[in-house]
Amino acid sequence: MEPGTARIAVDLLGGDDAPAVVVDGALRAMRADPDLHLLLVGPAEVADGLIGALDPVQRIRVTVRPVRAAVGMADHPVAARADSTVRAAVTAVRDGIADAVVSAGATGATVTAAALGLGRWPHVRRPALVATLPAVAGPVVLLDVGGSLEPGPATLVRHAVLGTAYAAVAHGVAEPRVGLLSVGTEAGKGDRLRRTADPLLAAVPLPHGARYVGLVEGYDIASGSRADVVVTDGFTGNVLLKAIEGAYAMAGGPPASGGVPRAAALLGVAGTVVVCHGAARGDDVASGIALAAHLWRRRATETVSALLDRAPQTPSQPGDHADRTTDTEVSL
């Protein structure tokens, strides 16, 4: 465990089984990390129940921001504009009361709340959700897994830079290999998005000595032998992530190189934001809180943002003037 205090704002009402599993996860996280401080955002009676389960020394590391409104899993992301728990948690980060936010609520609402409340990085049209997957040869960083469902080619290129910097800063990967997920490895394979993005990725300089290895397939993610960072659209990435989770459950567990991805970091906003699966259990929420603390202690968000600022900008492509907005996103 890395040293240093980390103040994490936790959305108590985010997730299918909130607040019970969120309270369980917060308790686990508190007991595992003596330098962790939590800001519990939600109904006071729920927070009081959690605090009552802690010993006196742990209780002084918990504060409460009473909020009763929640964004439902079926609600439109625009609901995040209201006075909801996820928006209040993001506001705490913006105001310097917390260092990072963790939510298992609706992905679209969390992304929207973060983008509106914290602001986006320059040159990032759509933030990306980044998950780290266990593979035979070592961890593989996969993005996007749900932040931008229908991006344009230039967005995929920016996400490649984001993923490369994240792999180096958050996971210590030296000279990451970057691949674009497609249906074959030969040049020209894939849909129009892949065919357009492939040569752009081949031409763009990547940070930390990274190199683009070309198109990769699904089994390359499982092996980890061809790429350390795999870029795709958020729709495909989210489906793939959940398929992998299901496969691990059926097989009895992931490879020995790492555990099932339980949370994703949101890159492209001016703050540390971690999104857990809506069906998260207590240990998943605890892992999300631990990830948020890890990223904050490494100042990962700030470092990745600085690397992105120094990276060359990708020229706009025909039809790439605006990524399509889907029902899990709003125009920002």
Functional labels for PLM-detected ranges:
Residues 56-98:
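Phosphate/nucleotide-donor binding subsite
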Residues 92-111, 185-189, 194-261:
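Glycine-rich phosphate-binding loop
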Residues 35-37, 171-178, 206-218, 258, ...:
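Flexible, glycine/charged-enriched surface loops at secondary-structure junctions
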Residues 115-142, 223-323:
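Glycine-rich phosphate/nucleotide-binding loop
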Residues 8-20, 147-157, 275-282:
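Short, glycine-rich nucleotide/cofactor-binding loops
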Residues 1-47:
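N-terminal phosphate-binding or glycine-rich loops at protein starts, especially the Walker A/P-loop
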Residues 33, 37-39, 44-45, 149-215, ...:
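Glycine-rich phosphate/diphosphate-binding loop of Rossmann-like nucleotide-binding domains
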